[in-house]
Each structure stands twice: as C-alpha cells, then as structure tokens.
Curated annotation (Swiss-Prot):
Compositional bias (Pro residues): 15-28
Protein name: Formyltetrahydrofolate deformylase
Sorted UniProt keywords: Hydrolase, One-carbon metabolism, Purine biosynthesis
Family: Belongs to the PurU family.
Pathway, per record: Purine metabolism; IMP biosynthesis via de novo pathway; formate from 10-formyl-5,6,7,8-tetrahydrofolate: step 1/1
E.C. no: 3.5.1.10
Top-level EC class as recorded in UniProt: hydrolase
Function: Catalyzes the hydrolysis of 10-formyltetrahydrofolate (formyl-FH4) to formate and tetrahydrofolate (FH4).
Xref: PANTHER family: FORMYLTETRAHYDROFOLATE DEFORMYLASE, FORMYLTETRAHYDROFOLATE DEFORMYLASE 2, MITOCHONDRIAL
A biological process term (GO) from this entry: 'de novo' IMP biosynthetic process
Gene Ontology MF, one: formyltetrahydrofolate deformylase activity
Region (Disordered): 1-30
Alphabetical list of InterPro entries matching this protein: ACT-like_dom_sf, ACT_dom, Formyl-FH4-Hydrolase_C, Formyl_transf_N, Formyl_transf_N_sf, PurU, PurU_ACT
Amino acid sequence: MGKGSMTAHATPNEPDYPPPPGGPPPPADIGRLLLRCHDRPGIIAAVSTFLARAGANIISLDQHSTAPEGGTFLQRAIFHLPGLTAAVDELQRDFGSTVADKFGIDYRFAEAAKPKRVAIMASTEDHCLLDLLWRNRRGELEMSVVMVIANHPDLAAHVRPFGVPFIHIPATRDTRTEAEQRQLQLLSGNVDLVVLARYMQILSPGFLEAIGCPLINIHHSFLPAFTGAAPYQRARERGVKLIGATAHYVTEVLDEGPIIEQDVVRVDHTHTVDDLVRVGADVERAVLSRAVLWHCQDRVIVHHNQTIVF
C-alpha cells in the first residue's frame, strides 16, 4: 500500500456531524484525515502542526497504538478548513512530502460533504437492500447509491421507487465469468464501495483484485457452526440462545475478512424457525447499516485482518 493511497475502510466516539434523519449533509469545509504507520514519538505533533500551518482547525482527534513499543499507530483527525474542496489535492501532496515521507505514513484525506458512490449487489432477499435504500433516502447514510446489481430480477419493482438503476445480471456457477466481466464494466472506477446485501454468489479472486474498491458483506453469525442451507432450522434444533450478524470486508477467504461490526439478540425455546428468521433479518439490517455508515464516514482503518473503528 503506497503512501497517499491508504484504503481506509473506518466507530463513533464523537459526533462528527452525523446527519439527522432527513437532515442536511455535513458542512462543506469539514475534512477527515486517516493515517497508519509504525509508532514512534512525534507523530501527533507533526500531524497537528501540519494542519495548523495549512489553516485548519482540528475538531476531533482519535488515535490508537497497537503496542507501547514497536506497535502500529492509527489516527483519525476531523478538521475544519475554509475552501477545503479547492485545497484537498494540495493537502494530499504537501502532507506526503512534509510528514508522511518522514514517518512512513500511509494516509488519506477525505471531504465529509462528499458522499461515497456506492453500488449494492443483491439476490432475492430484500431486507438488507431495502433497509439501506430507505435509510439513505432519509439522509441517515453518507452515500450516493448509484446502482443495484442483482443476479435475479425479483427485486426490480421494489428498487424502482427509490430512483436507483436496477441492473439484472444473471449469475450462476456456469456463467460466473461472463457475469463478473459485465459487473466489472459497470463498477470499476465508478464506485467507492460495493455492498453485498445478501448477494448469494461467491465472487472470484480475480473479481476482487480487479474491482478497485472495498466490498462489505453481511452474514448471520451462525457461521461456521451452521453453514449451508436451512441454518435457522438447524439452529433451533440445536437450541441456540443467541442470534447474531457480522459485517466484514470481503477478502479471497470466504467470510473471513476484517470484521467491521457485530451484534446479537437473545432467543429462547419459544422462538419458532420463522421467529428466528425474523430476528436474524432485523439484526442483519442493523449491523450492515452501521458498518456501511462507519465506512462512509471514514471511521474504519484496516490493520492486518482486523479493523480499528474510531
């Protein structure tokens, strides 16, 4: 990962201007700086001095070191800088030459008011897809949904009222290569994030390498105990006491990417299979929407195979 190209994928300890439901976007002159490097004295001072000399006022500053000595330092700074949009490219260059080169920092600047371009991929289950579209229409998510891609046509009528293009690309085990080529034509260079909202196809390593942006997936937290078909039936037969969900970044290793968010709900012997499915869908919606929001707010930094969420 080269300097200036940090793939920050980023938890909410401060307000950071989250838009209220239906409210305005973040102020235009609010910027975010994410960085990661080998820990050593002087990093915070150097970052703060650079921003001050650029005319920026730091609103909040969160940092974490993985160890007292020899650890990795991670930081997220929120700052106000008049005329940020015109200055952000210069900030990126100057920070690289004056601070990042000295400390070996991987970093990225972002404008809070510039929403992430997001594509959602789905199959036939609608709960996660429609929840994201609904929350986004209410102004709860800092993103612009540019398209929905599905390998089945079932959800087209549900997506149209949101004014988002629905693209049906059939994908089976036999047609996966052709389907992924078409998906890449639509996605590569056009989106900042892809959300797999219960997209029930395994993406190839070649697709993940070529896509050029992070992907977030959601799955129930029975994995790996109840993989495959009918997990809720088998979970009830086993007498599970907790139902949960995990949102994570997608890697070549299935369902083992860096975890962004997890949650659980307690269940008991009175819950039927249908009850478990309903509870599971509720927690999946909540977990996925939080993970997507945190990513779009530049709160997540990936460190090895885990995340630091500020």
